Amino acid sequence: MLAKIYSAAVYGVDAYEVEIEVNASGGHPVIVVVGLPDAAVKESRDRVTTAVSNSGYFWPRGRTTINLAPADIKKEGPSFDLPIALGMIAVSEEIDTSTFEKFSFVGELALDGAVRAVKGVLPVALEARRRGKHALFVPEANAQEAAMVDKIDIYGVQNLRQTFQFLRGEIPLLPARGDLSAFFATHQSYDVDFSDVKGQGHVKRAIEVAVAGGHNILMIGPPGSGKSMLSKRIATIIPPMSLEEAIETTKIHSIAGALDGEKSFVATRPFRSPHHTISDIGLLGGGAFPNPGEVSLAHNGVLFLDELPEFKRSALEVMRQPLEDGKVTISRAAGSLTFPSEFMLVAAMNPCPCGYFGDLKRECRCGPVQVQRYRQRISGPLLDRIDLHIEVPAVEYRDVASERAEEPSSAIRERAVRARELQQKRFAREAKTNCNARMTTRLLKQHCKLDQDSQDLVRVAMTELNLSARAYDRILKVSRTIADLDGAENIAPEHVSEAIQYRTFDRTLWV
């Protein structure tokens, strides 16, 4: 007898339908799984047969062939356990599975028949809805995540026996309920705020400029100056995510297994802060069956790299593609996967190995060669992709002790939103440009024209401050953003002057 059950598997950030065929025939008792299964899928034979027996059902005693179609795509993970078990029970008890055609099933089975949580349930639910399925059966722990998808019934099941009894009409089971729009509207608040940060007004201004134009930023300062504290609050002033951005971000976190019962949907900008010992694969993504890395988990949010020179050179170099293209392509013999990775890079570093170069209160123990060598750990091509460099001095006592209320994130975000709206209108006809940071050479010439005074200012700065040639385009882009924050149609000398201040690393005077 042949039984057909439908499931789904994740490939990249999307899911595709998998048809599971279970066929029982006479002969020596053996279970064969075909259709490019990985080790976890092959091991499901032992898990499933034990779970079926412990749930009080029988499994076919003859030769059982399990086919996972389409056969040209490798299947990975234990999420096929539940549908395979249902197919085996249906074959054993000679139940017609044609009534199951409008259902889809995912879930890992424990040996006692309990259904365990799996990764990637959100894209699976979206695919099931696209395929016109009436219902999706998922582990109870994943039910709220899947219930964010409307127009399809989501059933969170506890064990194999409960699932089969419901399908036979023996017990009732209520679908999980979720209102994505309502959840999204009520979960866009942050636990931190810029009003928590005392002083550092010029650094806050630089961060505001960076956010307003979508620029990457590097902060340089001694230990304890507040670089990490400032960085953790940057997401709070980025314009709020749209519902489409939130769904795309949640799909990536679902695939990576970064969601849980309390956080079934990502409604705020992600903030990722990997340790400097992270591997290339951990940062970029990859593996035998590629999973998203930190650059993709930071998609639509902030990637914070603290102690930037301490990261491996190879790890920093692999970031050049996602910074340039906004996506990560991972190639394997079986094909290529693409993960989105449009994030704002926020990096922080000490000015020297001891951390106190240029400090007026503590003596630096590093020589000029050590400082230069420390700085050179960051490659030129990576610095090319960071538009703003800002020095973060130690906080003065008068700022720490001040009772003056600091500006909240909401006020800063309002200004950033207005600047972004101007840029959206400016680049409405540009497919790959949505903010000033992504302007091409053609767009720079079109939208960043300087008057004579501004040109003279840039010329003097590049000559007197020994700014590198690569800094020129960055100055123009940042000047355009500062003008947008002022609501100015044209770039003025004061906009250029401020932009020049944000090129610390291009000044040979720095060392």
Put a short name on every predicted segment.
Residues 59-62, 99-100, 132, 150, ...:
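Short loop/turn elements that form and flank the Walker-type P-loop nucleotide-binding site
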Residues 300, 306-307, 318:
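Walker B catalytic acidic pair
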Residues 219-260:
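Walker A/P-loop
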Residues 18-24, 283, 387-390:
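Short beta-strand elements
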Residues 40-45, 58-60, 67-77, 289-290, ...:
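Basic, amphipathic alpha-helical bundle interface domains used for macromolecular binding and assembly
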